[in-house]
C-alpha cells in the first residue's frame, strides 16, 4: 500500500485485520501498565496490599475484576480494603490509559503518570479520529492475579517432550540433563498468561520455557 501511496499511513494501517489494529492499541496500553507496575515494584511498594490512593476492584468468580465497582482507598477504608485484598475479595488495580482514564491518586497515581511517560504516551489522547472504533476510554487491570489448583509431577518418558530432553542442553541452555523433567498444572483467570507464571517459577530466559 505504501509503495503506491507513500504517505497514506492510515490507509496502510487499515489494511491490517481489525483484530490486529485493536491489538496495537491494547499493546500501547499494556506498555504503559507495565512501566507503571515496574515503577511501583522498584519503589518497594506492594502490588497486593493497597495503600492510600489506590483503586481496588472486586474479584469476580471467574477471576476477572469488576471495574464498574472500583473504590478509592483512603484513610477511612484502608484497613477494610487491605483485609479484603488479603482474603482475595479485592485486587489492587493499575491503569490501562485512555481518553477518560480513572487514575489512582497519591503515590500510586504518581507511578501511573511515570509509567505513561516512560512509555512515551503522555501526549496521547487516545481518540483515533481516522478510525473511531479504535478510540478507547481506558480501563484498569489487576496488578496481580491468583493461580489455583497447582500440581507438580515428574513427566513420564513417554511424554512428547522427552525427545527434547534426550537431546540434552544446547549452547546457551541453563538446564542439566540429570535434572528432572516436570509437568506443572494450574488454573489461571481468563486473560492471564501461563508463560508469565512459568517464568516466575523457573527464573529462566524467555526462550527456556
Residues covered by each model-derived region:
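Non-catalytic, substrate/partner-engaging modules appended to enzymatic cores
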Residues: 1-209
Amino acid at each position: 500500500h505504501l509503495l503506491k501511496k507513500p504517505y497514506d499511513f492510515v490507509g496502510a494501517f487499515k489494511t491490517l485485520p481489525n483484530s490486529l489494529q485493536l491489538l496495537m492499541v491494547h499493546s500501547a496500553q499494556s506498555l504503559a501498565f507495565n512501566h507503571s507496575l515496574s515503577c511501583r515494584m522498584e519503589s518497594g511498594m506492594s502490588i497486593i496490599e493497597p495503600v492510600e490512593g489506590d483503586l481496588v476492584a472486586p474479584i469476580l468468580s471467574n477471576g476477572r475484576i469488576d471495574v464498574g465497582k472500583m473504590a478509592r482507598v483512603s484513610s477511612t477504608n484502608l484497613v477494610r480494603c487491605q483485609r479484603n485484598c488479603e482474603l482475595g475479595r479485592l485486587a489492587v488495580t493499575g491503569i490501562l490509559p485512555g481518553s477518560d482514564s480513572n487514575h489512582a491518586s497519591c503515590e500510586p497515581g504518581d507511578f501511573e503518570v511515570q509509567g505513561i511517560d516512560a512509555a512515551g504516551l503522555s501526549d496521547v489522547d487516545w481518540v483515533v479520529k481516522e478510525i473511531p472504533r479504535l478510540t478507547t476510554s481506558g480501563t484498569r487491570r489487576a496488578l496481580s492475579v491468583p493461580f489455583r489448583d497447582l500440581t507438580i509431577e515428574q513427566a513420564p518418558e513417554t511424554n512428547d517432550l522427552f525427545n527434547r530432553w534426550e537431546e540434552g542442553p544446547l549452547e546457551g541452555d541453563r538446564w542439566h540433563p540429570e535434572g528432572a523433567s516436570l509437568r506443572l498444572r494450574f488454573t489461571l483467570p481468563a486473560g492471564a498468561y501461563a508463560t508469565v507464571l512459568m517464568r516466575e517459577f523457573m527464573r529462566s530466559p524467555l526462550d527456556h520455557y
